[in-house]
């Protein structure tokens, strides 16, 4: 039986790993494996960017197919040997028990039989067919199995092809993320560099301001000390005068002494901490936008009569024609409108498109701040930043001051009610502009000063922020 095993090994080598049939027009790929020419071409047709071997997964750089004529000859030889083996097997097949030709086949036991094997105690009630009928039937069964297995192999090959494509897609996505990460890191480094320079500039300005104040204090003290020394010399000279002469001058001396003993005003000198924003807020802002964005809209009842509000109450424009406002407008002096909802707890984010408006103010105010607006607005009820001309200003609960920041076309506002903070960001760069720190004692609401220009101011919805 050794020659049978050798023939089986030879036949295995002549099968195509893709279709599992004898190799047709065999070709060899660069890793050394062999396939039918049509099979490997069909397999590679599903791979756009790569060409991998279905057996070893080797990435073939070039789709070079080398015809293998020698292997084709071996296949023909193996087929001839198999035919000879089949004839020899048919001629030599006999029943080992009865030494008769095996001419029958038991369908129940799937066993070859001779005429004497068909006995009641063993196969009497079984379905027994002639070897020709059984062979014909089982060839059909085997063909069905062959179709099923080939279909399964094709499915596996398709899945492998899809996974190969997924591998390519994965690499492309990873490369895209690497590029995006590089870009984001470069932006972050530029942001940090700009923030560092701006912080150092603010620190230098503060240092120079305090140095000037110190020099002013020193000059005032020097002048005061000089005056005191002059007074002391005058005192010593007065003491040397005659009694009558001395007494005639003491009145002027006492008056002069009282004036000179008043110490000059010394201005306090304390270096304040320079405001800056570094990666913590920068990286966390996207999560803030995702989790805390509110759909803020404009409260029509609070709008100045010269403000035109859109139907969806997200856009406001200054117009010279006064509008009919239901009820009594809260703001009659300034082109202001408030937003809804009001907030008395929680964290909230909203974004406002300001475009290139030359003047505007955005922030929050106490929900009842507008009640006294007709008389005199209370600056302590507001927390807002103002753009005017070419710079930002802080206006409200903190002392008014100018911010060194580039112009932004959109402003993000983040309110943390319990923490007592309202922060402003230049969008879409997510550049921190300013943070108010205070204690809120009642409801607050969004505040919008439009300015007397025709350019609109627009609120972004929660779905399109950043807008």
Swiss-Prot record:
Pfam families: PRY (PF13765), SPRY (PF00622), zf-B_box (PF00643), zf-C3HC4_4 (PF15227). Transmembrane segments: none annotated. Zn(2+) binds at residues 95, 98, 117, 123. It is found in: Cytoplasm, Cytoskeleton, Spindle. One of its GO terms (biological process) is female meiosis I. A zinc finger (RING-type) spans 16-57. Keywords: Coiled coil, Cytoplasm, Cytoskeleton, Metal-binding, Zinc, Zinc-finger. Its main location: cytoplasm. The keyword Coiled coil applies. Residues 276-466 form the B30.2/SPRY domain. Residues 168-222 form a coiled coil. PROSITE patterns: B302_SPRY (PS50188), ZF_BBOX (PS50119), ZF_RING_1 (PS00518), ZF_RING_2 (PS50089). SMART domains: BBOX, PRY, RING, SPRY. It comes from the Eukaryota. The keyword Secreted does not apply. One of its GO terms (molecular function) is zinc ion binding. A zinc finger (B box-type) spans 90-131. GO terms for cellular component: cytoplasm; spindle. InterPro entries: B30.2/SPRY, B30.2/SPRY_sf, Butyrophylin_SPRY, ConA-like_dom_sf, PRY, SPRY/PRY_TRIM75, SPRY_dom, TRIM/RBCC. May play a role in female meiosis. Belongs to the TRIM/RBCC family. This is Tripartite motif-containing protein 75. It comes from Mus musculus.
């Amino acid at each position: 039986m050794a020659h049978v095993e050798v023939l089986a090994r030879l036949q295995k080598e002549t099968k195509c790993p893709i279709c599992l049939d004898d190799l047709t027009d065999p070709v060899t790929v660069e890793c050394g494996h062999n396939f039918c020419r049509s099979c490997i071409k069909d397999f590679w047709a599903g791979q756009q960017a790569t060409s991998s071997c279905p057996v070893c997964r080797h990435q073939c750089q070039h789709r070079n197919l080398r015809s293998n004529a020698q292997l084709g000859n071996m296949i023909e030889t193996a087929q001839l040997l198999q035919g000879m083996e089949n004839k020899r097997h048919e001629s030599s097949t006999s029943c080992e028990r009865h030494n008769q030709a095996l001419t029958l086949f038991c369908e129940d036991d799937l066993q070859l039989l001779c005429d004497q094997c068909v006995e009641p105690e063993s196969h009497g009630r079984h379905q027994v067919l002639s070897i020709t009928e059984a062979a014909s039937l089982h060839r059909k069964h085997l063909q069905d199995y062959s179709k099923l297995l080939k279909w399964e192999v094709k499915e596996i090959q398709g899945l492998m092809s899809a996974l190969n494509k997924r591998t390519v897609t994965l690499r492309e996505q990873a490369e895209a993320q690497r590029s995006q990460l590089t870009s984001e890191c470069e932006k972050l480094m530029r942001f940090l560099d700009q923030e560092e320079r701006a912080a150092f500039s603010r620190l230098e300005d503060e240092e120079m301001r305090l140095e000037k104040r110190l020099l002013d204090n020193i000059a005032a003290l020097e002048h005061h000390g000089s005056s005191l020394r002059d007074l002391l010399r005058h005192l010593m000279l007065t003491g040397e005068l005659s009694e009558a002469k001395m007494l005639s001058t003491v009145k002027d001396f006492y008056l002069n002494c009282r004036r000179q003993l008043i110490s000059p005003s010394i201005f306090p000198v304390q270096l304040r901490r320079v405001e800056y924003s570094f990666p913590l807020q920068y990286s966390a802002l996207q999560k803030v936008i995702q989790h805390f964005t509110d759909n803020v809209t404009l409260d029509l009842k609070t709008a100045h009569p010269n403000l035109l509000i859109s139907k969806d109450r997200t856009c406001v424009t200054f117009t010279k024609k006064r509008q009919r406002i239901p009820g009594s407008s809260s703001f009659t002096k300034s082109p202001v409108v408030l937003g809804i909802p009001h907030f008395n707890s929680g964290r909230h984010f909203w974004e406002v498109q300001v475009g290139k408006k030359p003047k505007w103010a955005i922030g929050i105010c106490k929900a009842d701040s507008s009640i006294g607006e007709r008389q005199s607005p209370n600056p302590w009820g507001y927390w807002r930043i103002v753009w005017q001309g070419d710079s930002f200003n802080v206006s409200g609960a903190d002392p008014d001051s100018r911010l060194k920041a580039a112009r932004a076309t959109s402003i993000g506002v983040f309110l943390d009610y319990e923490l007592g903070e309202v922060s402003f960001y230049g969008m879409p760069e997510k550049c921190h502009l300013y943070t108010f720190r205070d204690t809120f004692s009642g409801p607050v609401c969004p505040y919008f000063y439009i300015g007397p220009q025709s350019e609109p101011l627009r609120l972004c919805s929660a779905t399109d922020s950043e807008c």
